[in-house]
Each structure stands twice: as structure tokens, then as C-alpha cells.
Amino acid sequence: EREQVSNLYLVPTLYHMLIEHPAFARERVASVEKIGFAGAPMSDGLMRRVEQAFQPQLFVNHYGSSEIYTFTIDQQASRKPGSSGRSALNQRVRVVPIDAESAQVQVKPMEEGQIVADLASDEAFEGYLNRSEATAKALREGWYFTGDTGYFDEDGDLFVTGRVDDLIITGGENISPVEIENVLSLHPAVEEVVVVGLPDEQWGKIIAAFIKLRAEVSESELDAYCITSGLAKFKRPRRYQFIDEIPKSPVGKVLRRVLLAQHQEQAQKG
């Protein structure tokens, strides 16, 4: 407000902290015209609230990594929530089968797979220092295997759905936590949500939602909301756990394994 900042480039967690702060007001950020985010996906619910709070001229989703700074960019992120846009300048991105060893076979539009990026980009790294096994796993035939999951829609826009390691396999189905998180994040009583898989003897994993609330809501109400939102039955959470805080790294990334370690026993008891 004092400095009349016109551009913001933050991780989603910092946008959440800003707009949820008691002192936040639209008039205090009226000078901000352009905003961007990177470092983690922004849920549909948070994106809607950020759009309403800042009403920016430009809303950029910058998808990249430390290994290759930019994969794709969407300069109007809120027009299609979840979209990471198209390949950046001098970059090529593909989606290949989850367990692919080569980048030559690509999946069809709307089919989820692993995201890979061309190493010919000027922003690309050459490998991990003194980590030959990690380099061999990530770099194959001139492509960087990101470990991220996603898909291209029919328009050619990339959607990042999570990490290969975070996929929940339940009853033989691969389920992305992000899809479920996006649905629940739009419920007015939900402030933040993280979806994980809990071990289960029958299903392998069951879907559990850890939720920080902004208002009272019951598990049955949330389940009904998932139904009306069109979420398939096998993707709906079997457990809901209401918690005070969601653990995050210093840069705002959700620490799913820390969350599981903190709450797994209680969540499994239901």
C-alpha cells in the first residue's frame, strides 16, 4: 500500500496468507495490476478468491522447476482454473505414460501421464551434481522427466495434477489428489484442503481429506457437495479429518508426508 506495488509474484500460500489476513482490504492493494504464481498449484477455490481480491489485469501461472526454470505459462490463469497454459519460448513439453522409459510415446488429450520437458531449452540444467543415479533417472534421450503428473486438454493447454509419488491407487484406479482438492476447495466452509491416501487392507489405499475450516460443516455435507459437484463415487473421500493447520515448507509447499505422520493414526481410526 505504502510503496504502491504494481506487480506481485508469489507462491500460492503467500496469496492465501495475504487475503486471509484480518487487515486485508481491496483498497489496500488497488495499485496491483499484474499477479503471478509459481512453486505449487493453486486450488480452484483459492484462485477464485485471489481473482476477486485483486481483480488483476494479468494473472499468470508460471509452471517450471529448479531444473528447468520454465515449462509452460498461462497469462490468463483464472479463465481456465488449473491450466498451466502452453509451452514457453524455446521449450517443448509432452505428457507420456506414467511408467514410460522414453518420451517418444505420448498419451492422448485428457489422458493423465507424466510431464516431460525438452532439455534443449536455454534454461535447462545438465544434471545433478555428484548424483549420477538421480541424473540417469531424470534425464532420458534429451528429455527431463519431471515426476509431475498432468494432461493436455483438447485446446492444448497443460493441466498439472500432482506428483507421480502422490498418486493414490485405490481399487486399481490411479487417482490424482488435486482433482479432489479442487472440488472441496470451492466449498465456502473450506479454507484449505489436502487429500492423501491411507493404507487399507481391502482397497490398497483409501482417500482421506485433511481440511482446515473457515466455518462449521459436517462430513456428510462435504460428501453431498462432492456428489453435486460431479465427483465420481470412487474419487470421493472415505475419511474427513478437520485440523488446525496444514504443514508447509518455508516456500509454501504442502508437506504431505509430515501431515500423514502427524495425523495418520487418528485418520485411520475414522
What is each of the regions a protein language model found here?
Residues R2-L10, I19-G82, A88-R92, Q104:
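Gly/Ser/Thr-rich phosphate-binding loop
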Residues L8-V11, V93, L119-S121, E126-G127, ...:
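AMP-binding/adenylate-forming catalytic core of the ANL superfamily
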Residues H16, R48, G82, E133, ...:
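Active-site phosphate/pyrophosphate- and oxyanion-stabilizing loops and adjacent acidic/basic residues
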Residues V29-V32, V190, P237:
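Core-facing hydrophobic residues within beta-strands of well-ordered domains
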Residues F37, V195, R239-F242:
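Hydrophobic/anchoring residues in structured secondary elements
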Residues N90, E101-K137, I175:
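Conserved ATP/PPi-binding loop(s) of AMP-dependent carboxylate-activating enzymes
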Residues Y240-V251:
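Short proline/glycine- and acidic-rich turn/helix-capping motifs at secondary-structure junctions
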Residues A261-G270:
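Acidic/polar alpha-helix N-cap and adjacent early helical turns
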